[in-house]
A protein has these predicted regions:
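Catalytic cores of NTP-dependent nucleotidyl/adenyl transfer enzymes across multiple folds
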Residues: 124, 128-201
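Active-site nucleotide-donor binding segment shared across nucleotidyl transfer reactions
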Residues: 39-70, 74-78
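A contiguous binding-surface segment within folded domains or other stable secondary-structure elements
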Residues: 78, 85, 95
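Conserved catalytic core of two-metal-ion nucleotidyltransferases
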Residues: 92-125
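Short amphipathic alpha-helices in soluble, non-transmembrane regions
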Residues: 82-90
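Short amphipathic alpha-helical segments
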Residues: 17-19, 66-70, 116-118, 133
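Helical scaffold of the NTase/Pol beta-like nucleotidyltransferase catalytic core
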Residues: 1-52
Length: 201
């Protein structure tokens, strides 16, 4: 009898859903746009203060897990629970909850990854370091390539330990988030708006 995901231990989940990196796929952008439309349909545009494609799949030309990360910001604390409950009713699974942060996923099954997999990072307005990191790497392809090399070096070492894989990237990410905030705060935001306009066209 196959266990349900919520019945599995962390080690069992890591075995079923290993770290697996692939070359950049242009269709990741399309996955994001379709899922963004689904989220707006489910939640309504008014509750969503910001929605973004984040993570390595949003950075051109680098290897990434075949999982599209989405950041969704809401304006009120009470909206976090309401949005979470609506998403759970629409095929999303809660991965973790902490202070003013909820992580959900879609595309995880008892048989392994589905064809399309998403991670949703539900946050309060302004909690978006991932945007600084994405934009900085988009503006600095050499740093993006260094990040790719770091991930490739960690892949097999931590293939079945996602927490260790994530922790090993933290110092690199935090360093360039700080760089983006301290040296290029306004330009990073302007770059994002320009890139958003390009995506719409």
């Amino acid at each position: 009898m196959i266990k349900k995901l919520e019945e599995m231990s962390l080690e069992e989940l890591w075995q079923l859903f290993p770290i697996f990196l692939v070359e950049h796929k242009s269709e990741w952008k399309d996955w994001y746009e379709l899922e963004k439309a689904n989220l707006i349909k489910i939640l309504g545009a008014n509750v969503i203060k910001r929605i973004e494609h984040i993570g390595s799949t949003a950075i051109p030309n680098i290897w990434a897990k075949n999982i599209v990360d989405i950041l969704l910001e809401v304006g009120r604390k009470e909206d976090l629970a309401r949005v979470r409950d609506l998403l759970v009713k629409n095929s999303w699974l809660v991965m973790s909850e902490s202070h003013n942060r909820i992580s959900l996923n879609k595309g995880y099954t008892e048989q392994g990854f589905a064809e399309k997999v998403f991670h949703l990072h539900l946050r309060m307005t302004g909690d978006h370091d991932e945007i600084y990191f994405r934009d900085y790497l988009c503006q600095h392809p050499d740093i993006a390539q260094a990040y790719q090399e770091l991930k490739l070096s960690l892949w097999k070492k931590f293939e079945h330990n996602r927490d260790a894989y994530t922790d090993a990237k933290t110092d690199f990410i935090n360093h360039y988030v700080s760089e983006a905030k301290s040296s290029n705060f306004q330009e990073s935001e302007k770059f994002y708006q320009k890139s958003l306009d390009r995506r719409k066209n």
